[in-house]
From Swiss-Prot:
It comes from the Viruses. Belongs to the pneumoviruses glycoprotein G family. This is Major surface glycoprotein G. Residues 67-257 are extracellular. The gene is G. InterPro entries: G_prot. Glycans are attached at residues 72, 80, 85, 87, 92, 105, 127, 139, 199, 215, 233, 251, 253. The keyword Disulfide bond applies. Coiled coil: none annotated. The keyword Secreted applies.
Amino acid sequence: MSNHTHHLKFKTLKRAWKASKYFIVGLSCLYKFNLKSLVQTALSTLAMITLTSLVITAIIYISVGNAKAKPTSKPTIQQTQQPQNHTSPFFTEHNYKSTHTSIQSTTLSQLLNIDTTRGITYGHSTNETQNRKIKGQSTLPATRKPPINPSGSIPPENHQDHNNFQTLPYVPCSTCEGNLACLSLCHIETERAPSRAPTITLKKTPKPKTTKKPTKTTIHHRTSPETKLQPKNNTATPQQGILSSTEHHTNQSTTQI
């Protein structure tokens, strides 16, 4: 398209140059015949035509240059943006498979070493062991790595990931449905049955209850020695005893006189 437009512009300029030549020849002929007024008008019109043609050609070249600059800049931007957004699915799948197999091999080797070297007795209840099931083909997320416990103790169970292949408690063989990995672990685990840890209950000794005894209030009365020798079966009130003792004392005093 650009070559075709340039060819058309060249043809138009060539025709204009030929027309200007013929116009100049005609003006020279008129000048020879002493027609000065006609020559002046013709020259003025020729100057106006040339100026307008130059302005038009300049505008055309500027517009063509801007149109050419726009498509050249677009492909460079697209080429720079394409490698950033491009991701190959083959490499991601290959990396995922390699990491998945390495994680499974490390977890199985650790569990076998723990079972053979150490006689660890698990204190888990039977309900927890029945609820935990192992699946042979477990799908782990690519971004997450399972925690590795170097001390040999059993890590806590993650309730969100039921397919986690790392936590392997005592598994009965009845739960393994044709899974070779589960059957191998089941045979190893049957050699040592889990023993339940004894529960120790502390009895609280009851505190002895202390009861306060009521204090007796003693009333001291002035009595004579005769009243002291009276028997305890006397049912009279203490006031009557006091009055009788005083009367007896006065009678003795009168007899002595």
